[in-house]
From Swiss-Prot:
It comes from Drosophila pseudoobscura pseudoobscura. Residues 7-16, 226-253, 420-431 have a biased composition (Gly residues). The modification Phosphothreonine is found at residue 657. CDD domains: UBA_UBP2_like. InterPro entries: TC-DDR_regulator, UBA-like_sf, UBAP2/Lig. Residues 44-58, 180-198, 204-215, 1287-1297 have a biased composition (Basic and acidic residues). This is Protein lingerer. Residues 1-65, 129-311, 335-439, 488-552, 601-638, 749-792, 851-906, 1182-1219, 1236-1256, 1287-1327 are annotated as: Disordered. Keywords: Behavior, Cytoplasm, Phosphoprotein. Residues 33-43, 140-156, 376-396, 507-520, 614-638, 759-770, 779-792, 854-867, 873-906, 1298-1319 have a biased composition (Low complexity). The gene is lig. Residues 80-120 form the UBA domain. One of its GO terms (cellular component) is cytoplasm. It is found in: Cytoplasm.
Amino acid sequence: MSTQTRSGGGGGGGGNSRSQKKSNSANVGGGTAHDAAPHAAANKKGDANKTDKPEKAQPKATTEQLRIAQITNSTTEDPQINEKVTLLLTMTQRSEEEVCCALNECDYDLEAAANFLIEELPQGAFAKYEKKRKRPASTAADGAAGDGEWADGNANADKRENTRNRSSNRGGGRGGTDSRGWRGRETRENERNTRESRGGGGERGGERGDDRANDNYRGQRNGGRSAPGGGGGRGGGFVSRSGRGGGRMGGRSSGPRGDRTSGSGGFGAGRSSNANEDHHEVELWDNTIAQNAEKQQPGHDDSWGDWNNEEYEGSLKDSKVFTTSNLSTQTAAAVVSGGGAAAGAASSTGSGGELSAPPGLEHHLGSMGTTGEDNSGSSGPPATPPSALSGSATTPLLQYSAAVSNPPPQMQSQGTQHSSGGGTAAGGGGSASSSFVSAASDTFTSAASAAATLVQQAQQQQQLQQTTPIKPSATLSVEQSQYFNSLASQGVSPGSTAVQPTPAGYAPSSATAYSQTSTSVGGGGGVGGSTYPSTYANVFGSTAGDQSQQQTQVRRARVKLPPPSKIPATAVEMPGDNALNNIGYLDVQFGALDFGTDDSFDSMPEKFNASVEQQQQQQDDYQSKSQQQQQSTLTAGLQSSQIGDALSAAGYAARSTAQQQQQSASSTVASNALDQLTKNDPYGQASSASSAYQNAYQSSAASKANSAYQTSAQGSYSSSSYANVQSSVANSYQQQGYGSYQPNVNSYQQQQTVAGTQPSVGGVVPGSGSASTQNIPVGGSASQNSSSGNASSAYLTSGYSTPQSAYQSSQSVYGNSSGFAGSASNASSQYASFGTSAKLKDASTASGAAHYDSVSTSSGVSSSSGSTGNGAAGAVSGQPGVNQASVSNNNNVSGSSSNSNVTAGVTSGNVAGGGVSQSGVSSGGVGVAGGSGSASSVGVNVNNNNAGSVGGAAVAAQTAAGTAAVLASLTNKNSSSSNSSGSGVGGGATTAGGVGGASTGSGVGAGSGAGSGGGGGSGSGLVPTNIQMVSQYIQTGLPYYQQPVYSYEELQMMQQRVPHVQGYYDLNYTPTSLGAGRDNLGSVAYSTMTDGRFARTDNNSSPVSNVSSTMSQQAGSSAPMLNVPYAYFYGGNVMPGGFQYGTPAIYPQQIPTANTASGGQFPKPSYSAGYGSTNYDTLSQTTQDYSKGGYSTSVNQQTKTQTVSNQPQAGTASDLTSSMYGKGHVALNKVNSYEKQSFHSGTPPPFNMANTQTAGGTSAQPYGMYLPMPAAGHHNMIHQPIHQMDGRIHSSSRRDSNSAGQRQQSSSQSKSAGKQGYSPSYWTGQN
């Protein structure tokens, strides 16, 4: 073989010196060693002469070599070929080697090659084909000269063959066989192949593959494999080759061969050297002589080195890790370039992700990382998040994955940081919140977009870097692309996403994402709440637009995707499949595996959003153009502009509720998401209501549908600490119930958060109606809340207290105030508030009674006069209700105010708009503004709870009550469902409060109308509804409802088992009696069998001992053993029954009783007791005696055995028994068996009765147990035991009859005597 030592620079051929075979070996490590060994082998070929010839020989191209050279040499096509190979690899999913071969065969006709691969070329056929070719070539090239030439010529073939031969001779050691002319060559080839494929691959790839285009296919296939891969050898060759051959994971598609270097960040050096070396390759061939000479000497050593390195490398290579050999390098590069300082940390996470990421992806990371860093640098403001992004998001996908899995903590922490700072940094104050929102939305959307962008970009880069990217994109993008595609399919409104300008400065977006997340957590005002859903929706919406493109590209990657995606497509798609709300939570949680209440939703948005944002950041880097669109899309989707408008503190606050509502109307566009919400919001409040409550809330969310959704989900979930607390429940549940109250809580909390998180919004919110948006309570807080004291934090105390005060005031003394404060006491505050406060307070409102029930919801508006109880007046009241609303708001908080809200609600709608006092409703008023009606409804339903939920004030107040708020929400929700009033509107409000959070926006609007009307109607239902909600809510807490079903089942089992328990134990016991056979055999096995083995005499004596002493022991031992296992089993095995089985004590009692009744060994005595101890004992003895009569031999043995076993009784029994059963013993078997049968049939009842009397539980239980047997509906556990029990019950009879049976046996067989002995000992065991 020619001295193609040319060590691929990457390949381990560190020393590229062609001439130095050994040095090459050293450089290459195993690979070079292989090279050396093969050369040595060539020299060694065994024929020194041949060796000389190879040195001397100037490689003559054999015809085959010429053909190979021609085939391999289409340098002009290389760039195209790389593309073709990549394309074919993608299309056919064949190995790169096969693809290249097919291309060669088909003249690089892509279509023909594809057909060839798919239709004609079986898997591996090509490899076989080449092998055949090679061998003939090798055979032909037996001559030394031929050898050198042949080896040279075959180098290409070898490369082809390498893959096959790769393992053929791992040790260069085969060189020893070189003496065999051509075989030595073959060995060398194999070694070289191995070398090339292994560590040597670098060398070989360098020597071979790169220079020759075709070699690239062949040699590269092999050499390329190793060379670029370097140690990996697999990844190294041309893209075409390296991908399959090289890393078989390695950049399957690299950039153009020339670009390989650039294409793979890490590969570059190795590859470039390889490329250069490719040219040198020829020279290396000349060097073959020197190498061979050197190799001969070190050949073995090299072989060793080869073997070790090769072996090792081989395993690594073979283990197809998606991380390219370059991976670490690129990861480092990504970290270094992309990571930035934050990148270091993020990168560590991202890196981890990256490592898992396909190598190609990492290349993206490398370049993107750099780009990302640059971008992050450009981003500047987001620099910190971007750094995290750049690092963690080094690759958008990685980032995405990392964000999904890793980021949440970062997201949250950053979110928190950014909340105040980040948001501000993100934009102006309002801008900041906008940023947050957009960021959050962007984050998620960005995640989607980032994923889409990532996919696109990855695909673009794939195109650029044909080699590496495909896999990476395939790896992550598949899942993500699927996921995002699903999102896209669900995409709320691509338009929504598309709108946002990048302005948030992607960085702000990122910061926002974090802060937003926190905002979301905090509530981030409407934004916070909205943000996540916005993000989520945006992901769908913006992603929808982006993804459509992405998706196409993704599809390209997808070809390979199937292997890489390890996350079930369903899991990924889940969120898209279902309503954004629940599944979004679930999916995110699923991805994050965060089931924590906060983490599941809030963290997820944060991490999800943040990761998205990071990705997006990279998109900036990674796919700046795409991102610009996406960003604008995402950001726009985020409502950046809207948020900028609405959210900007002044702007948002400035926006009248009407304006907000308008926005909400646009938000209603959110109906995409919102529609889903509307699903949550059957109240219809979702869409229209969104304009009202959600509008404000959602508008701030500004993420149109997202807002709505978000509001409900994010805001409600995220915002409310309560939701956070209950996030798991709240997440899914909240939208409906929690969402409403949670947003209330959220709102409540959000305001705090908002105030903290979104200083601009927060500040504004508290100050202005926007606050209502902020959770309207906040807004309400600003106006009403302050009066209410609903102020966000005050919520519990001030807000709550104030309502409480108001409530108390209006409530008068009604305990409700505390009850409302007890709002924690859900029913109390709600019911009390509503009913009580409304009711007592209803003094003000005639509706009070209904009001109580409905929370005056039925009074709905009028009751809602709320404080006033004016339904219609409510409208009027609502306006006056401003004051009244105030009071009412207090009432709202009180819940009485809910009435006022209702009244105010409608009025409150008015008030809502104006309703400073409504502010309590204020959220209703402000948030509800348009939704005031809803607020009023809300007010009614929740009494501001909904309004509060809308207004958040009541909710906030209740939220202060917290659960009360929740319950109120729930109640409201239900009532909302029932009560349009708070719930209807409240649905907007209440629901808005909870579901309504999103819904609230919508709910509120709808709610207001619905609220009062629905409120009234549903109001009456409200209480029960609330109860349902509560129960349902509690049920979630309770899962006991199901458990009760289980418990019920359990109960049945237990009940049946109660008899069964004893019966079950009895079965245990019975198995013992059955065991009497068994156990007697077993116990006797210990005594008789074992003893018999030891000595029958002892055995007999042993039973004798057993009769007196051991009887107790065995009873203690055997019975307890049974009990213990059963007790254990009942506990462990029969859990439910186990409890009941907890009665094992009964069984033990039963056992002694049974023993007593049965008589231990002496079931005979006990039986005899029933029948006459003498007779019974005689029965056994009789068997013996009879046996004696019937079978003297048996009798003797039996007598001995039995006598020994039972001696005392045995003797007695035998005498009596023999006389009694002498008759039967004539027809020994029949009589005994018959009697035994009879005993089962006839005797057992008496026996059971006797036992029942004596054993009491035992027989009765078996009997009772027997009944339950059919009764055992749950025959799973029970059935078997019962089944056993059934047999065992008979057994128990046998147990008693066992002696008789044993008699029979004993009479029939000497063994029987032993069995008698067994039964006695067994019975003794019983006792």
